[in-house]
Each structure stands twice: as C-alpha cells, then as structure tokens.
Regions:
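Acidic/histidine-rich catalytic neighborhood
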Residues: 177-228
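Short secondary-structure boundary/capping segments
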Residues: 65-68, 145-148, 185-191, 289-292
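Structural motif
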Residues: 129-133, 171, 274, 313
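His/Asp/Glu-rich, glycine-adjacent segments
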Residues: 2-143, 225, 236-239, 245-252, ...
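Short catalytic/ligand-binding loop motif for oxyanion handling, primarily in non-cytosolic enzymes
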Residues: 57-63, 138-142, 179-182, 187, ...
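Active-site neighborhoods of enzymes that stabilize oxyanions during catalysis
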Residues: 18, 211-341
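Metal-dependent active-site segment of extracytoplasmic phospho-/sulfohydrolases and closely related
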Residues: 151-195, 275
C-alpha cells in the first residue's frame, strides 16, 4: 500500500499493545499509519482509484486520504458490500450492480466477490490504479493440492485471465506464506508462551502479544509463529531471552533492537523481545485465552521465517529488474507501474 516496510509505515500486524495505557488494540485505524498510501498519492495527482478488499478491517486503511465526492475513487469491502454508500465508498447498491449477494466471510465466495468486482470496475469505471485484496481463509484451511484449494485457484485464475484481457499491468503477490502447524492427531501445534513465562518467572512479569490476533478466529485461532514480549523490568531482558531459548521449537529470539533492525519493524510498536517458532509450530499466549472452537481442519498458519517467501508474478516482462536487491511484496506497485509505461 505504501511501497515501504513497516518500519516506515508503522503497521506491523493486526494487533499491538500500548504499555502506557495497557490497551491491546487492532491496527485497522488510519491514525496508526505513518506514511501515505500509493493510492492517496496517485489520487492527488488526478488518477482514478479502485480498491476492493475482502475483509472490511482493511478498508479504512486502503481508502485513507481519498475523497469520494468527485467520482474518481471507489473503495469497499466484500464483507460489508451491502453497506457501501456513495458518500463513504464512492459507490452504492454494490450487490445489485455486481449481481452477487453479500458472501459468507468464511468462504471462497468472499474472494470471488473481490475478483468479480475488480473485473467489472476495470470494464466500467476504468481506474488508473486498482488494488484487489482477497482473504486467506482457503489457504488457512486447505493445503495446496486439496480439492477445495484447487477449486479456489481455478476461480482465481479465471478472473486473472479476464483482467489480463483488458491490456493492463498486473502484479500478483501475497502478504505471507502458509505452513501446516498441527500435530499428528490434527490438534494445533502450539507453545503457550505466556503460561510458560508465568511459571518460569513471577506471573504477569512478562506480557506476550501476538500480532496475528484478529476477530476472524476461524482462520487460525490467533495462533501464529511470531510473538513479541513486553517486560516491566527491562533489566530482566537477558534472563527472559535465555529462558525462551530453552524452549524446543522456538528458533528465533532477539532483543527489540536486534529484531527491528533485522526485520524492518517499528521499535515503538514492538516489545522488548521478539521471537519466532520453527516451521511447523505456533506461539500462543495463555492456553485459556485462545478460542480454537472454529479450527475444524488441521491448523495452517504463518508469521515465522518459513512463511516469508511469497509469489511475485507479473503478466508482463519486468523491465529494469535489479537482481542485486531483495524483492519484497511492497515493490508490487513499482513494478506494476514500470510494466505499464
């Protein structure tokens, strides 16, 4: 959205903690953004912008800085498509316009709604810049090669083909990968780090925060492979780091400064310690705080080093690709625009 890492734009997860107030809050409010979006900059230069997201939690971030009173911007979610208005989204009566009802949030249909809307917007609204954000529900539930997963990608491929017919530059990428994180019996494979630290030290000496946390618990039950730990007593950092290193299947344990400089994270939105689990393991806080009732399939999740690699697919031959530099998903618009020139 910004062409920059989270150390610049400030959004470093779904969820973060403010030690000053003791609040744990979702990062879906534009006030947490520290950089303008590419969409805002193009809009201000006179371009037409179309943004469609599956989950409504992203909509206000995507549409930040846009105005919807001059018919140059459209921004809505599939999840709340029936609530879109001209004043707030640049479009109304979305479901009638698209000929599709509001999809179930935990379904393939949520992403198909986004893709179908993208095709129709490209044909009718003709934006200069368009961003389509699907949901990872299917990827959380079904491994590659599964019949349901194959059906999803056949649907996705169909719409990419329709978009490609419109003589546009397309980049397909992802925010993260996905790995199986369950035991042989199908139950989640998790280290409940808050419980561990409460027993190892005094209770509540440490505060474990999981940035993957969001309201969509059916996806992953807030179990991912990344955690950050806040300590009231900063003199205990080394002893807590050493204690976490003793845990089998925790493969990265870094201080705040080490972790933020290594992974381009904003230090003031990270705890005193950053850790990541191994490939097939997740990190939880306290076992009794996780709602796992929606995990009807074996857990698949993300957040660690093993889910960093993502696809980066262009429908055009990329010009001036600098192979000496690491390519990131936030480079998508640079190369999409490069391909359009």
């Amino acid at each position: 959205m910004t062409g920059q890492p989270s150390s610049v734009h400030g959004i470093c997860g779904n969820f973060f903690y403010t030690p000053e107030t003791g609040e744990e809050v979702m990062m879906n409010d534009p006030k947490y953004m520290r950089a303008p979006t590419i969409f805002e900059k193009f809009y201000n230069s006179g371009s037409k912008i179309a943004l469609v997201t599956a989950k409504d939690k992203l909509r206000t971030l995507l549409g930040n800085g846009l105005s919807f009173d001059d018919e140059r911007a459209i921004c809505f979610s599939a999840e709340k498509s029936d609530q879109a208005t001209k004043d707030l989204n640049g479009i109304d009566n979305v479901n009638d316009w698209l000929g599709m009802p509001v999809p179930e949030v935990y379904s393939e249909g949520l992403s198909e709604f986004v893709m179908a809307a993208g095709v129709k917007l490209l044909e009718e609204f003709k934006p200069n810049i368009m961003y389509l954000s699907t949901t990872d529900y299917i990827q959380h539930k079904y491994a590659p090669g599964n019949e349901t997963a194959n059906k999803f990608y056949a649907m996705f491929d169909k719409y990419i083909g329709l978009l490609n017919k419109e003589n546009v530059s397309i980049i397909i990428t992802a925010d993260h990968g996905m790995k199986p994180k369950s035991k042989e019996d199908g139950s989640p494979n998790a280290i409940f780090l808050q419980d561990y630290l409460d027993k190892k030290f005094e209770p509540n000496m440490a505060k474990v925060i999981l940035p993957i946390t969001d309201p969509y618990v059916v996806h992953h039950g807030s179990l991912g492979s990344f955690a950050t730990i806040y300590l009231e007593d900063k003199s205990k950092v080394d002893s807590v780091v050493n204690a976490i290193k003793e845990i089998k299947d925790i493969e990265v344990v870094l201080t705040k400064d080490e972790g933020c400089s290594t992974y381009n994270l904003p230090p003031d939105r990270m705890g005193d310690i950053i850790c990541m689990s191994s490939e097939f393991m997740t990190i939880g806080s306290s076992e009794d705080k996780h709602n796992l009732s929606g995990l009807n399939e074996p857990l698949r999740s993300h957040g660690g080093l093993h889910e960093r690699e993502v696809p980066f697919i262009s429908n055009l031959k990329l010009q001036n690709l600098d192979t000496s530099k690491q390519l990131y998903n936030y480079d998508a618009f640079y190369y999409a625009i490069n391909g359009a020139l």
